Amino acid sequence: GCDSLAIAIGTSHGAYKFTPEQCTLNEQGILVPPALRFDVLEEVTKRLPGFPIVLHGSSSVPQEYVEMVNTYGGAMPGAIGVPEEQLRHAAELAVCKINIDSDLRLAMTGTIRKFFAEHPDKFDPREYLKPARANIKELVRHKLINVLGCAGKA
């Protein structure tokens, strides 16, 4: 049997889900990716009511962490993720699992890069992993409460 179904509605793995050419510029000059295919999600939900739906590659690629990575020696130009509002909408429809690993890796990598830039003499993992863990914890808290809508539902 099948326990859950991962459908393709416009997400993809990694930090480069969309090219700048696929996006539009908003009033603030920020690239906005195309909308997810909610029509496909709604059709699958109609045909398989109550069936667990999964979204792979659904990181929002927080720009504050992309900027942190880039500021402290990384090179991630054009990293664009799925807007959190769209992920929230997917969670409100039928999606029960949304994979956001790239967001966590960005938070950890950016924080560690910043730590080493500010403390080049340090080498103890207990020191540089402490702020990285704190940022990941805060990011997960934000996602659970504000994006995924699953805080307190364990």
Q: Model-derived features: where do they sit?
A:
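Glycine-rich beta-alpha junction loops
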Residues: 9-13, 59-61, 102-106
